[in-house]
């Protein structure tokens, strides 16, 4: 049976899975402050020896987003699970095309 997690919460399915991919923006924080219920659920996932990845499409390295989250008060143990699209792009370029030319489309960084 499908559960409506908006009503029953993620903690209702923690025992059913080993790994969770969780969107960061809007789920764990709103850009200004952390969502305490989400933080408590992440701690519960950890206590139950489960794993999670906090995904974001931020076009920056993981380290930049971790600094942003630290300023909001997120504990290091939770921040260490962040993975950004910017980090994925950097990893891909370093692995496959480090010496090749490429054209960047987007705002200057």
Report residues per predicted region:
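HAD-like aspartate-dependent phosphatase fold
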Residues: 1-109
């Amino acid at each position: 049976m499908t559960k409506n997690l908006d009503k029953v919460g993620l903690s209702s399915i923690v025992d059913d899975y080993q790994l969770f991919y969780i969107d960061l923006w809007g789920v764990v924080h709103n850009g200004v402050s952390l969502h305490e219920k989400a933080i408590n659920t992440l701690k519960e996932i950890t206590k139950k020896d489960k794993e999670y990845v906090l995904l974001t499409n931020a076009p920056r390295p993981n380290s930049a987003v971790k600094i942003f989250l630290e300023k909001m008060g997120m504990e290091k143990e939770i921040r260490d699970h962040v993975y950004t699209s910017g980090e994925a792009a950097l990893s891909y370029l370093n692995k496959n095309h480090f010496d090749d030319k490429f054209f960047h489309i987007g705002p200057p960084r």
